[in-house]
Structure formats: structure tokens, C-alpha cells
């Protein structure tokens, strides 16, 4: 568990690790629900896919692995909820554990960790601004957070690959 606590977010667009063109799956890990988003094949735009209910039997891992296959994902990006003080809390440990379990199921497809501080808060604000009532937000908030995580990754990836091309 010591190594798990010291894991840091991966770098989008790292030339040594980037799988190239293809769909990416974004995952927002919650204690009850897991939000899932997917990019287009050119990795430009993230859109919501579904919310997967967590289950002690591991059914949620089977569903996530099935989505990777169904959507043809070349990379999976799991949100890493670091604290504002940049520490690894219990939510981050949970996300790392889920990412590790999923990685074992879908190898060789890479599973990355992405800094996701405040994405759920940002998603709630966006939904509120769009006129979605609090009660209705519960059904889509996890997907909206997954979209925010993945879109941030895609934007950073695009900037990093552009810089690498200019170098």
C-alpha cells in the first residue's frame, strides 16, 4: 500500500506512453457510482456514456472492461481526486485501487491517472447553470464529472503533442 500512496497523476501526451489516435475512456470513481465518458476517435471531444453502479461482486469492473472493448478504447483515464493540499486521501486510494484492478482486466490497454481536483464541483455548477435541478443532477453528475476529467486530459494531450511536434 505504500507505493499506492505515492502515485501521482500521469502526464497527458507523454511521447513514450501515448497510444496515438483512438478513443479514450474517462472514469470518475465514486463510492456508489462510476461516471463514464468517451472521446471521439481523434481524441478531441469527450461525451457522456453511462453511470455504472458499484458492486461488491466486481460487476462494475466487468462492465467497465466491456465498455473498453465495445467502444474500442486505446486508453483509459481515471480521475485521481488529490486533496487541495496535493495529498492522497481515501478517495484517491479508492480510485487508484479501481484503476489497478481495471488495468489487470484490460491489459495491454493502458490505464492512466489524471488530476481531477474539483471536477465534480465544476460539473455541478455547469449542470446548475444549464437549469438542471439538484434532484435530476444525481443521475448525470458522475457522467458530467467523467466528461470534465476526460476533456481536460484531451486538451492537455493535444497541447503536449503539439509542443512535441514543434520541438
From Swiss-Prot:
CDD domains linked: YqgF
Gene Ontology terms, MF aspect: nuclease activity
Predominant location category: cytoplasm
InterPro entries in the cross-refs: RNaseH-like_sf, YqgF, YqgF/RNaseH-like_dom, YqgF/RNaseH-like_dom_sf
Origin superkingdom: Bacteria
GO cellular component: cytosol
Disulfide pattern: none
Keyword Hydrolase: yes
Location(s) in or outside the cell: Cytoplasm
Basic and acidic residues bias locations: 7-21
One Pfam family this sequence matches: RuvX
BP-aspect Gene Ontology terms: rRNA 5'-end processing
EC nos: 3.1.-.-
Key words, A-Z: Cytoplasm, Hydrolase, Nuclease, Ribosome biogenesis
Annotated region (Disordered), positions in chain: 1-24
Family: Belongs to the YqgF nuclease family.
Function per UniProt: Could be a nuclease involved in processing of the 5'-end of pre-16S rRNA.
Protein name stated in the entry: Putative pre-16S rRNA nuclease
Organism from which the protein derives: Mycolicibacterium paratuberculosis (strain ATCC BAA-968 / K-10)
Organism taxonomic ancestry: Bacteria, Bacillati, Actinomycetota, Actinomycetes, Mycobacteriales
